[in-house]
């Protein structure tokens, strides 16, 4: 089978995506890809979702954060960004998704927007709501575990002074 000439090949754009979640959440590329497809289909419909053709090329999961590169067709970056902002959970874990930037090549996307592993995280015991609680520290954030249900409360260093 012959290759298509360069001017007939589909052109792509690559979205660098930063994902933030609670420290105990864990999900992989497959779960994130599934949620991206559902978000695109719910927002854009079947034909709009097919036109954007969003695919997760790379996914790196760290403790409470993740980074991904999502491929979409050229000219469909705005609908793709809108679909990504509709994501609020992956595998029943709450997430915050932020598009860091858009590039024309995967390499440029990695070099400009993918930062690699975040700073170190550590476990501390802090006093929160007049009780000794366990907290995961990711400067400048503190994720304090609540005693009742094991959920987390987001805080900053200013909340402990």
UniProtKB/Swiss-Prot annotation:
The keyword tRNA processing applies. GO terms for molecular function: ribonuclease P activity; ribonuclease P RNA binding. Keywords: Cytoplasm, Endonuclease, Hydrolase, Nuclease, tRNA processing. Its main location: cytoplasm. Its EC number is 3.1.26.5. It catalyses: Endonucleolytic cleavage of RNA, removing 5'-extranucleotides from tRNA precursor. Pfam families: RNase_P_Rpp14. GO terms for biological process: tRNA 5'-leader removal. InterPro entries: Pop5/Rpp14/Rnp2-like, Rnp2-like_sf. SUPFAM superfamilies: Rnp2-like. It is found in: Cytoplasm. The keyword Hydrolase applies. One of its GO terms (cellular component) is multimeric ribonuclease P complex. HAMAP family: RNase_P_2. Belongs to the eukaryotic/archaeal RNase P protein component 2 family. Part of ribonuclease P, a protein complex that generates mature tRNA molecules by cleaving their 5'-ends. Consists of a catalytic RNA component and at least 4-5 protein subunits. This is Ribonuclease P protein component 2. It comes from Haloarcula marismortui (strain ATCC 43049 / DSM 3752 / JCM 8966 / VKM B-1809). The gene is rnp2.
């Amino acid at each position: 089978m012959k290759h298509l000439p360069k001017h007939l090949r589909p052109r792509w754009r690559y979205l660098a995506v930063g994902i933030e979640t609670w420290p105990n959440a864990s999900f992989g590329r497959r779960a994130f890809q599934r949620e991206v497809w559902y978000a695109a289909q719910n927002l854009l419909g079947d034909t709009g979702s097919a036109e954007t053709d969003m695919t997760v090329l790379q996914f790196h999961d760290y403790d409470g954060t993740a980074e991904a590169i999502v491929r979409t067709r050229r000219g469909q970056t705005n609908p793709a960004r809108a679909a990504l902002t509709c994501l609020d959970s992956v595998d029943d874990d709450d997430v915050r998704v932020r598009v860091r930037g858009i590039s024309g090549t995967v390499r440029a996307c990695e070099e400009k927007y993918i930062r690699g592993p975040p700073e170190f995280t550590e476990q501390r015991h802090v006093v929160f709501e007049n009780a000794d609680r366990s907290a995961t520290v990711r400067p400048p954030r503190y994720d304090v575990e609540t005693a009742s249900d094991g959920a987390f409360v987001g805080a900053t260093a200013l909340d402990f002074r």
